[in-house]
Amino acid sequence: VPDGLRLRRAHPQDLDDIMWLEHVSFPADAWSASQMSGELYSPHGYYVVVETVDESAAPSVVGYAGLSSLAGNPVADVQTIAVAAEQRGKGLGRVLFTELLDEARRRGVREVFLEVRADNPVAQSMYTAFGFEHIATRPRYYQPDGVDAWVMRAELPVAADATPSSSPSPSTVGPIGQEALDERG
């Protein structure tokens, strides 16, 4: 993971940056700003961003991801994940996805579901590496281009300190660097 990046909890003030990345990442089927805003404000959601950290410039969001789970429910859904094109191939998708799964464990989630485009083998491969299995296909799910969605599922071991009513993680997750990855095991 390159130096100069930080992983942190997303805030509603990140909406414009997230929406810019949403539209360039998913031009045919991007979420609306009101949908994304609803996710950022939802008490059931957990969204994180990867941003640049440079003392000479304002931070810039280069990746984001979101999870949704109702309090006390052992099931969660990965809502979205995106990394800026110029940052792909550096492991940021894995960092974002790992944080979502860690939060799911902290919430006592036992099963995680997601949908991924059938024409996105890179994402499918990453999810498979995390133990997700293709369990169903939703024909023509992604509109307007009519691409099928793979529904994928994984079971999670629950973290020792997780309780279904555990509070969300602190707003600052921390820097991304080899040290942070080493700490995650």
PLM features: residue spans?
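Acetyl-CoA-dependent GNAT
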Residues: 2-5, 9-15, 19-86, 94-107, ...
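Well-formed, non-transmembrane alpha-helical positions, independent of function
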Residues: 17, 125-126
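Active-site acidic-Proline motif in GNAT/NAT acetyltransferases
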Residues: 83-86, 90, 118-120
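Acyl-donor (CoA/ACP) binding surface of acyl/acetyltransferases
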Residues: 90, 138-141, 155-157
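Short glycine-rich hinge loops at helix-strand junctions in the catalytic core
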Residues: 91, 108, 131
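Short glycine/proline-centered loop/turn elements that form peptide/ligand docking sites
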Residues: 97, 120-123, 140-145
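Conserved catalytic-core motifs of GNAT/GCN5-like acyltransferases
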Residues: 113-115, 128, 133-150
